[in-house]
């Protein structure tokens, strides 16, 4: 029966139109909803279960399972009015007016209303509103469990927003809309109200209706949504990261979700973040980007998986996200990718900004007196957070710029912290503070700081091929997200700050002072010139004197050199780009790999190839998305010079 009902529903109800839907769906839906609610709900009691059930259902959903499950539950669940109400909403939804749905749904009405606003608006702002609306409403809805209700409401709100969002997404793409809806609905609703069943039911329906709408059952939009979920998940990895993956696996995911949901509050938050992320995420799957922020591990999971923020996310990091990670945190990565919660991740902004904002963990300090010492700075600046230590030297990563003639401090320095948030906090905290009698001016270190330091990337490096901003500067921006927005990010991490120590020849100012030398770079033999030229130049860039014989670039760049050159594109990115640290693979990059290779290669080619992983270590597992990228190179990384052509060519057909 269920199956028939379902099919009927799908075809008849869905097709007939939500209007018809109202009537029919009400019944069918009621059942479904009920069933759904029941299932989920029952399961929900055990969040995991619920999620599981739902997930399964979802999986099955496409098939009859849903119907069957639904069918079954219907009887038991028939009672729920929500279904009816929902049916209406559904139809509303079907109608396409989320708003309608909102209005229709009783319990969820308020929420929905908000939602509708959301849906119609798809604006995130609505989002924000939603939560409020939802919360209030939900509480009403869930009179049963007030507490639950509230959480629910929030969740609901969020969920719904998700829905709304989903809607947006929905249009977007695929199921995100429904996806969010469903997850949101089911789990959130359930957890929230014990009775959520109505809501859930409605929610489910909503989702379902979407589905119908969506896939019109057969594909089961939902499922597809779910499938999407993965993408959505990616998108919202934050919130849904697991889901996403899971979603595909529905059950587990769901369970997770449930659990997430179970923790309504957290879910909510998550969700909201997600949402936020979502917005972004969906927008761009930046998700992962901030995703991080979002769900935290969750997000990150995806997020960054979803890029984190996925709501990878976070995109967590969140959030962000989308695309790659989450979808998230990226574009569909980046696409919309608004900034994730974290911003930084997403922060795709101008090439420089991303680095600075999102992954820049160093600050540039001006206004120091000429007797300042490294220890003085370390003691003073550690008030705000942990100053990064140079593992090789055991010294804090603080670089005091010295006057070349007098050898005394010029009054400015860079201080590297363990993470970008700390650096940002330090800027806010120390800017304008008095230090040893002088007023400090503190800002995030730029790739190209005012001083000609050895910082990687500082000078435009002759022409190195890429715009300086992408250059590895202090951390190599990693490039504006490149394909993956987020990726960029950390990029240069390593490369950057001199504080790290003399990075190979590169970091040393010798010679050009502000020009970083790479392995193979040669100095013009003309006594009146002495210009440092890139290894690939055959004549001096200044006086055109021919390159002296025998000056061939060494096969590998000096050990430290080039470390961080983040490549243009986030891809390269120092450390792995996406992940903060390369970590495991960063989204895309082979994690650490990037670190080192960075741009390396290409010696003038900027692109060089993927230096990135090349050099670095194992390359890290390939990022979720980027298989090719990810671990692609890894290993020792070929000659630093990067065989210019080789990899470059190799990567031509797959720019990302």
UniProtKB/Swiss-Prot annotation:
Signal peptide stretch: none
Known outcome of mutating residue 652 to A: Cytoplasmic localization
Family: Belongs to the RRM TET family.
Ranges spanned by the short sequence motif Nuclear localization signal, renumbered to the chain: 639-656
Domain RRM: from-to ranges: 361-447
Gene encoding the protein: EWSR1
Principal localisation: nucleus
Entry's Gene Ontology molecular function annotations: calmodulin binding; identical protein binding; RNA binding; transcription coregulator activity; zinc ion binding
Tissue: Ubiquitous.
Name of the protein in its database record: RNA-binding protein EWS
């Amino acid at each position: 029966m269920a199956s028939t009902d379902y099919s009927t529903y799908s075809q008849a109800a869905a097709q007939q139109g939500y209007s018809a839907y109202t009537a029919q769906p009400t019944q069918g839906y009621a059942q479904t909803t009920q069933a759904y609610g029941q299932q989920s709900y029952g399961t929900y009691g055990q969040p995991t279960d619920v999620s599981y059930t739902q997930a399964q259902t979802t999986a099955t959903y496409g098939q009859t399972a849903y119907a069957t499950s639904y069918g079954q539950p219907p009887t038991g669940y028939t009672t729920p009015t929500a279904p009816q109400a929902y049916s209406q909403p559904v139809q509303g939804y079907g109608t396409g007016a989320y708003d309608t749905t909102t209005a229709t749904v009783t319990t969820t009405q308020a929420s929905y209303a908000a939602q509708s606003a959301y849906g119609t608006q798809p604006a995130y702002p609505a989002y924000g509103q939603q939560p409020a609306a939802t919360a209030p409403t939900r509480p009403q809805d869930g009179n049963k469990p007030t507490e639950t209700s509230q959480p629910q409401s929030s969740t609901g709100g969020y969920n719904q927003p998700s829905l709304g969002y989903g809607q947006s997404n929905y249009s977007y793409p695929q199921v995100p809309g429904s996806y969010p809806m469903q997850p949101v609905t089911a789990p959130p609703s359930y957890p929230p109200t014990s009775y959520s069943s109505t809501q859930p039911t409605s929610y489910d329906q909503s989702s379902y209706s979407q589905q119908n709408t969506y896939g019109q059952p057969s594909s089961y939009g939902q499922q597809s949504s779910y499938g999407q979920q993965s993408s959505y998940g990616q998108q919202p990895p934050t919130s849904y990261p697991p889901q996403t993956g899971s979603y595909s696996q529905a059950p587990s995911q769901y369970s997770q979700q449930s659990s997430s949901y179970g923790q309504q509050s957290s879910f909510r938050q998550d969700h909201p973040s997600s949402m936020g992320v979502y917005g972004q995420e969906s927008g761009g799957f930046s998700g992962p980007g901030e995703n991080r922020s979002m769900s935290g591990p969750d997000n990150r999971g995806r997020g960054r998986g979803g890029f984190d923020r996925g709501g990878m996310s976070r995109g967590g990091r969140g959030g962000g996200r989308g695309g790659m990670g989450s979808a998230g945190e990226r574009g569909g990565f980046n696409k919309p990718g608004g900034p994730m919660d974290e911003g930084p991740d997403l922060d795709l902004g101008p090439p420089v900004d991303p680095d600075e904002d999102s992954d820049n963990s160093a600050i540039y300090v001006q206004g120091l007196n000429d007797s300042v010492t490294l220890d003085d700075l370390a003691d003073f600046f550690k008030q705000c957070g942990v100053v990064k230590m140079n593992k090789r030297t055991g010294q804090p990563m603080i670089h005091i710029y010295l006057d070349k003639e007098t050898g005394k401090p010029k009054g400015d320095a860079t201080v590297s912290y363990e993470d970008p948030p700390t650096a940002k906090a330090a800027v806010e905290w120390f800017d304008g503070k008095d230090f040893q009698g002088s007023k400090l001016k503190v800002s995030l270190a730029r790739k190209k700081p005012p001083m000609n330091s050895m910082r990687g990337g500082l000078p435009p490096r002759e022409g190195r091929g890429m715009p300086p901003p992408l250059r590895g500067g202090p951390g190599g921006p990693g490039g504006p997200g490149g394909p993956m927005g987020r990726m960029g990010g950390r990029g240069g991490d390593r490369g950057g700050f001199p504080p790290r120590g003399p990075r190979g020849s590169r970091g040393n100012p010798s010679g050009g002072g502000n020009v970083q030398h790479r392995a193979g770079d040669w100095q013009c033999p003309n006594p009146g010139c002495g210009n440092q030229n890139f290894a690939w130049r055959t004549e001096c860039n200044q006086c055109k004197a021919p390159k002296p014989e025998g000056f061939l670039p060494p096969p590998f760049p000096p050990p430290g050199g080039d470390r961080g050159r983040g490549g243009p594109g986030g891809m390269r990115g120092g450390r792995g780009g996406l992940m903060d640290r390369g970590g495991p693979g960063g989204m895309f990059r082979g994690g650490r790999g990037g670190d080192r290779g960075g741009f390396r290669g290409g010696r003038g080619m900027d692109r060089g190839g993927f230096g990135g992983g090349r050099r670095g270590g194992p390359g890290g597992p390939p990022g979720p998305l980027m298989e090719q990228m990810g671990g692609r190179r890894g290993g020792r990384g070929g000659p630093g010079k990067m065989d210019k052509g080789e990899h470059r060519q190799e990567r031509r057909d797959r720019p990302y």
